[in-house]
């Protein structure tokens, strides 16, 4: 009689089912991991880190350890509160939270000296701005990279004559071994302080009990020592690795430039072609990465120049002027004149349509929004004027400016002491290459009026830009502020002076800057970039560059930046003309016989809103507004230790974030670890035993045997 066959081992199907169940349990655990993390940690989403920057000689900025730095939060509201952090507190390291008004050099020096007890620093942005001023920049900006040196005006080198930024404390140029973050959201700051009060506040001087509120900051930087070191490492990686790990990038972007009369950009001007240069800077910075409002240090001046360019372009005889005018907006001037030094380099090498020998005169706008008694100061270089020819040219330049200012009562042009040097300015880089007649227009005769130079406080409030509370955002956009009127007056003086410097004689009085243009530009750059006017002047694919807040003017390493694009398109729309081309023709004008891409740039912009206020009327704008590379020549030449050109780089990083959570005592952490380890061992033993006895525990049911007849 036949019998049914049966196996003594575990059924493979049962083992497969066991593996499937184990996988499902593991997957469920992973899926629940994020949920558990959200219950433990509160992420801080509106923060700005201090990052590491490097140059030819050293590194500045901040960083955390590779796994982030964690510390018990302690709020410092007055100087005495530091004692707990530096000596008395029993649970170091501490994460210090302080209001921005306490963010001073003296306090930072104390923290820097006790790094074993400091995990990091969180700075809450508070208002109003410190009345005494705050500037983390140095007192002599761009020292060593301007025109003055031991061989050229040694008495003016290193700001021996004038400390231009007298309030500068140099914090932004220090190196800190712990992370420092700016808290930009007031609500997040309140959450942190509430957590501190609930868990960390000591009673009667005694130590608080666990759990304690802690903060963790991640900002580990990949680059170290200097630009030469990090660029060399990146170069080696790029040469020998399939997937190179770049550790730093040069600070770079694009200069924005345009010509009053179009020129062929595929060649260079003839030697006898004369060009008047009107220049200003686009960038600023602060202690924190990509927080650079730059209202007085940058925005007011480039807004004024945009308005002057618009006014000059409307002059009736602009196409017949004997000399051309070039408007230039330099990027990276904060970091040792990146933009201007690159343009001078390209001019010298014949890589730019305008050559140095074509420059007839140079008019630069410095800081111009904080004038006192209506005064605008005309700064010149005393050293180059030792040459009689240059002195006569400068005298003619100043006389032209004074004549132009005479028709604008709201602007009083003044000459500082003739032996006074130039303030930090792009003109200095041109003077290093060639003696030219130039002037820098500024609201200060000596040290800066700007108490918040290159700081988080150089905002709209610093230049008195404010709006009535009852107005809507659209009404704010078109509300002409007193600051806009004042800057429009300066733009009118500049426009008329440029008209006369270009050889114009008949229509100087018709050159008039529009306060409406100035107020729209100020609102867009300092209050809300995502507004109807900025939307109308940009390409559709650039809409994402417009946020609901102000634009930031840090040069960065990814380019072009938001500011660069918006300034380019603002310049194009203010000085260009709308041409009757289709979208396809605008994007490829070479197919249109009457158009010339060597002379003009063509942009298909969104245009103004249709009457139904939902659709836009796109159009093609033809202008001479272009971009030119603003990368220091040091990186073109691989001279990473250069003292001639800027060598600033920005370190790369993997993770930038901040979060708070409750931290247990060391004893409880040890107990938890021990129990967890015990459970792990027990689980492994149980798993081993089950696996060893699987043939007994998981016996497959016998199949019914075959029946014999």
UniProtKB/Swiss-Prot annotation:
Gene Ontology biological process: adult behavior; amyloid precursor protein biosynthetic process; amyloid precursor protein catabolic process; amyloid precursor protein metabolic process; amyloid-beta formation; cellular response to calcium ion; central nervous system myelination; cerebellum development
Effect recorded for residue 653 to A/F: No effect on gamma-secretase activity
GO molecular function, one term: ATPase binding
Location in or out of the cell: Membrane; Cytoplasmic vesicle membrane; Melanosome
InterPro entries associated with the record: Ncstrn_small (IPR041084), Nicastrin (IPR008710)
Cysteine pairs bridged by disulfides in the record: 50-62, 140-159, 195-213, 230-248, 586-620
Cytoplasmic side: 691-709
Tissue-specificity statement: Detected in brain (at protein level). Widely expressed.
Glycan-linked positions: 45, 55, 187, 200, 204, 264, 387, 417, 435, 464, 506, 530, 562, 573, 580, 612
Induction comment from the UniProt entry of this chain: Constitutively expressed in neural cells.
Post-translational modification (record): N-glycosylated.
Signal peptide range in chain numbering: 1-33
Transmembrane segments: 670-690
Topological domain spans for side Extracellular: 34-669
Subunit and interaction comment: Component of the gamma-secretase complex. The functional gamma-secretase complex is composed of at least four polypeptides: a presenilin homodimer (PSEN1 or PSEN2), nicastrin (NCSTN), APH1 (APH1A or APH1B) and PSENEN/PEN2. Binds to proteolytic processed C-terminal fragments C83 and C99 of the amyloid precursor protein (APP). Interacts with PSEN1 and PSEN2.
Entry's disease: Acne inversa, familial, 1: A chronic relapsing inflammatory disease of the hair follicles characterized by recurrent draining sinuses, painful skin abscesses, and disfiguring scars. Manifestations typically appear after puberty.
Protein name in UniProt: Nicastrin
Species this protein is from: Homo sapiens
Species classification: Eukaryota, Metazoa, Chordata, Craniata, Vertebrata
């Amino acid at each position: 009689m036949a019998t049914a066959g049966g196996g003594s081992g575990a059924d493979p199907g049962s083992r497969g089912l066991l593996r499937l169940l184990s996988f499902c349990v593991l997957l469920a655990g992973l899926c629940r991991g994020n949920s558990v993390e959200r219950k433990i940690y509160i992420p801080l989403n509106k923060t700005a880190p201090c990052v590491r920057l490097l140059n030819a000689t050293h590194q500045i900025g901040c960083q955390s350890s590779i796994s982030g730095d964690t510390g018990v939060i302690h709020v410092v509201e007055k100087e005495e509160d530091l004692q707990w952090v530096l000596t008395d507190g029993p649970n170091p390291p501490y994460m210090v939270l302080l209001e921005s008004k306490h963010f001073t050099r003296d306090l930072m020096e104390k923290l820097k000296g006790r790094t074993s007890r400091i995990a990091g620093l969180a700075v809450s942005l508070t208002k109003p701005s410190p009345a005494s001023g705050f500037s983390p920049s140095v007192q002599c900006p761009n020292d060593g990279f301007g025109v003055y040196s031991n061989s050229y005006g040694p008495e003016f080198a290193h700001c021996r004559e004038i400390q231009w930024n007298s309030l500068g404390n140099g914090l932004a140029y220090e190196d800190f071994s712990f992370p420092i973050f700016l808290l930009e959201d007031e609500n997040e700051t309140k959450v942190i302080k509430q957590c501190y009060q609930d868990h960390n506040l000591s009673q009667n001087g005694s130590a608080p009990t666990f759990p304690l509120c802690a903060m963790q900051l991640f900002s580990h930087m990949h680059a170290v020592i200097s630009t030469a070191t990090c660029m060399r490492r990146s170069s080696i990686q790029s040469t020998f690795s399939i997937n190179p790990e770049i550790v730093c990038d040069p600070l770079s972007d694009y200069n924005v430039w345009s010509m009053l009369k179009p020129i062929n950009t595929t060649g260079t001007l003839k030697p006898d072609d004369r060009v008047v240069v009107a220049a200003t800077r686009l960038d600023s910075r602060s202690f924190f990465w990509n927080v650079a409002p730059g209202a007085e240090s940058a925005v007011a001046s480039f807004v004024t120049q945009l308005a002057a360019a618009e006014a000059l372009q409307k002059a009736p005889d602009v196409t017949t002027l004997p000399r051309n005018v070039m408007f230039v907006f330099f990027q990276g001037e904060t970091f040792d004149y990146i933009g201007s030094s690159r343009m001078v380099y390209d001019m010298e090498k014949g890589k730019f349509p305008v050559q140095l020998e074509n420059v007839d005169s140079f008019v630069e706008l410095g800081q111009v929004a904080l004038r006192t008694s209506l005064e605008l100061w005309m700064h010149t270089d005393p050293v180059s004027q030792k040459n009689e020819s240059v002195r006569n040219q400068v005298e003619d330049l100043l006389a032209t400016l004074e004549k132009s200012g005479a028709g604008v009562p709201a602007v009083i042009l003044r000459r500082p002491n003739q032996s006074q040097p130039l303030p930090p300015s792009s003109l200095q880089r041109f003077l290093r290459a060639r003696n030219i007649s130039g002037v820098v227009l500024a609201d200060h005769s000596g040290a800066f009026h700007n108490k918040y130079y290159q700081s988080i406080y150089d905002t709209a409030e610093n230049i008195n830009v404010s709006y009535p509370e009852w107005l809507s955002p659209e009404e704010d956009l078109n509300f002409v502020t007193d600051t806009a009127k004042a800057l429009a007056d300066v733009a009118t003086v500049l426009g008329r002076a440029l008209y006369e410097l270009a050889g114009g004689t008949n229509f100087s009085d018709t050159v008039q800057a529009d306060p409406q243009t100035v107020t729209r530009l100020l609102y867009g750059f300092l209050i809300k970039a995502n507004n109807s006017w900025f939307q109308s002047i940009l390409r559709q694919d650039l809409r994402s560059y417009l946020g609901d807040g102000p634009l930031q003017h840090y040069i960065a390493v990814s380019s072009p930046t938001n500011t660069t694009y918006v300034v380019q398109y603002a310049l194009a729309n203010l000085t260009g003309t709308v041409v009757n081309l289709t979208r396809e023709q605008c994007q490829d004008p070479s197919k249109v016989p009457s158009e010339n891409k060597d002379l003009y740039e063509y942009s298909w912009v969104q245009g103004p809103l249709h009457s139904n206020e939902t659709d836009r009327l796109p159009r093609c704008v033809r202008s001479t507004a272009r971009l030119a590379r603003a990368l220091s020549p040091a990186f073109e030449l691989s001279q990473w230790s250069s003292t001639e050109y800027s060598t600033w780089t920005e370190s790369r990083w993997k993770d930038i974030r901040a979060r708070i959570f409750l931290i247990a005592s060391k004893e409880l952490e040890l107990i938890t670890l021990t129990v967890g380890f015990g459970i792990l061992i027990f689980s492994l033993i149980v798993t081993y035993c089950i696996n060893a006895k699987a043939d007994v525990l998981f016996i497959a049911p016998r199949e019914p045997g075959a029946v014999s007849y």
